[in-house]
Amino acid sequence: MSIKLTATTRTDLGKGASRRLRHADLVPAIVYGADKEAVSLTFTHKDIIKAEGIEAFYSSVLDLEIDGVSEQVVLKDLQRHAFKARIQHLDLLRVDAKHKLHTTVPLHFINEGLSEAIKNGGIVYRTINEVEVLCLPKDLPSFIEVDISTMEIGDTLHLSNITLPAGVESVELNKGEEHDLPMVSIALSKKAPAEEIEAETAE
């Protein structure tokens, strides 16, 4: 799914200018990278709210149009108001098709409904919900699936247990085996009947 953002350049900079933009229901932003000059931008708040409601907004290459000129970017930072439902600022990074990106991708834990361990009283404990990856822009996945259907009570899946898409590397695993982080585990519910606990122990 391609997400398109439309922005205009701005020359009125500083805290006062940003405050005025926010009062006008606009979002100040900046785009930088790819050996090009950083450019200050303005988005409409409603457009950003609509885009950020899509999970892929945070982990996909975005199509950015600035004053009619298009380029590709990824989201590097999004600042929210401390207590209001408002977005304060965006940082966007230009992508170079020939250079690898270091970014985060969400994990989707699938097939809980097929898990016998869960049916027998197991509880799923997720340790992490996203993973750092290194890949070319064309290979960047919107998410990575983790199938837990065959897990048994007491099992833990680590980063090394998932199959990454072609061209995608795990930043943590590249550091060595000691960085093979646990992602998800299944433990027996404390509310499970005593006979189920005994059955699991016997197995």
Swiss-Prot record:
CDD domains: Ribosomal_L25_TL5_CTC (cd00495). Pfam families: Ribosomal_L25p, Ribosomal_TL5_C. GO terms for cellular component: cytosolic large ribosomal subunit. The keyword Aminoacyl-tRNA synthetase does not apply. It comes from the Bacteria. GO terms for biological process: translation. Disulfide bonds: none annotated. One of its GO terms (molecular function) is 5S rRNA binding. The keyword Ligase does not apply. HAMAP family: Ribosomal_bL25, Ribosomal_bL25_CTC. This is one of the proteins that binds to the 5S RNA in the ribosome where it forms part of the central protuberance. Belongs to the bacterial ribosomal protein bL25 family. CTC subfamily. NCBIfam families: bL25_bact_ctc (TIGR00731), PRK05618.1-5 (NF004130), PRK05943.1 (NF004612). Part of the 50S ribosomal subunit; part of the 5S rRNA/L5/L18/L25 subcomplex. Contacts the 5S rRNA. Binds to the 5S rRNA independently of L5 and L18. This is Large ribosomal subunit protein bL25. It comes from Psychromonas ingrahamii (strain DSM 17664 / CCUG 51855 / 37).
